[in-house]
From Swiss-Prot:
Keywords: Ribonucleoprotein, Ribosomal protein. NCBIfam families: rplM_bact. InterPro entries: Ribosomal_uL13 (IPR005822), Ribosomal_uL13_bac-type (IPR005823), Ribosomal_uL13_sf (IPR036899). It comes from Rhizobium meliloti (strain 1021). The gene is rplM. This is Large ribosomal subunit protein uL13.
């Protein structure tokens, strides 16, 4: 029996909706990364984008554990000499784009390269509870029920 290899034409992508309210960012990002890569499917093939489309709502209400809210720093470089910049998780969450915390966490759990970039395009993160993907009829995934450690009571 030969090893099963999924062909890109055979891929069936589902739409999944996740409410991030009260969920721990790292655990949520790990689950999302696995869904984007398709590792939860029996038809997983490493070189094929066979993951699902994931919609995350209420990203601003996701929770960081420990002192990460105040101490975790996000760095980037402008490209100019001495252009290293940093922001804390608190500044990002309270800023204009709080969904970036979840996006960055997932991005750093997905492989770097052309396939990883293509898989990241299947992730849609929204700070509030509204999203424009009702027509896709996404299936709701209750992450809090999967494991009690996935939530953090404030």
């Amino acid at each position: 029996m030969a090893t099963f290899v999924q062909k890109p034409a055979e891929v069936e992508k589902k739409w999944i909706l996740i409410d991030a309210e009260g969920l721990v960012v790292g655990r949520l990002a790990s689950l999302i990364a696995n869904r984007l890569r398709g590792k939860h499917k029996a038809t997983y093939t490493p070189h094929v984008d066979d993951g699902d489309n994931v919609i995350v709502i209420n990203a601003e209400k996701a929770v960081l554990t420990g002192k990460k809210y105040t101490d975790k720093k996000y760095y980037w470089h402008t490209g100019y000499p001495g252009g290293i910049k940093e922001r804390t998780a608190r500044q990002i969450i309270e800023g204009r784009f709080p969904e970036r915390v979840i996006e960055k966490a997932v991005e750093r759990m997905v492989p770097r390269g052309p396939l990883g970039r293509r898989q990241m395009k299947n992730l849609r993160v929204y700070a509030g509870s509204n999203h424009p993907h009702e027509a896709q009829q996404p299936a709701v995934l209750d992450v809090a029920k999967l494991n009690s450690k996935n939530t953090r009571s404030a």
